[in-house]
Amino acid sequence: SNTAIGNDSLDSNTTGSNNTAVGVDSLQANTTGTLNTAIGMLSLNANTTANNNTGVGQASLYNNTTGENNTSGGQASLYNNTTGGTNTAFGRASMYWNTTGSHNVGVGADALTANTTGPRNTAVGFQALRYVTTGDNNTSLGYLTGSSGTGLATGYGNTLIGAYTGTTGTTTNYANVLGMDVSGAGGYTTLGQGGSDIRAAHGNTSWSTVSDERYK
């Protein structure tokens, strides 16, 4: 059985079952999708056949059509997702532009907001990884991580921990950065704060001060 509360909620449903739609136009286009929960005006509005999605907040998962196993909480979170699956987004406009990217986690307002097709990214913090579009396998924890300075966009395999931590370029790969307001180069592990950092190349290279190991 289904539960529909609100004008035009579950309006197009045919054989879909075990759906809950609360709010005007929530799950409005759903036909055969099952086990979906939409709470908030326009939440999961375009969903047709997809299953096991949860959208809480105005227009959350608004454009989702066939993407499955997504969880979205916050106004316009995962708004443009269409076929991407197994994504988790909490916070206003988190993962807003995601369309087909899958297995991503964005927690915090505007976290991973520009991601479109990039998979397996984790961003926790206000505007964390906000400029990443197609990058993959990035992990970011902290306020504006990966978003200050140049802003990571298409790089992959980066780990950024600490407020304002980032990379030296938009396409940086395999940078490990720990500290506050410090940027790391690809292929290096960087620790510290601001300009006072130490850095070592991955592998057997010993730690060096920033003065002789700064990426140029």
Question: Where on the chain are the PLM-derived regions?
Answer:
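Glycine- and small/polar-enriched repetitive beta-structure motifs of secreted/surface proteins
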Residues: S1-D212
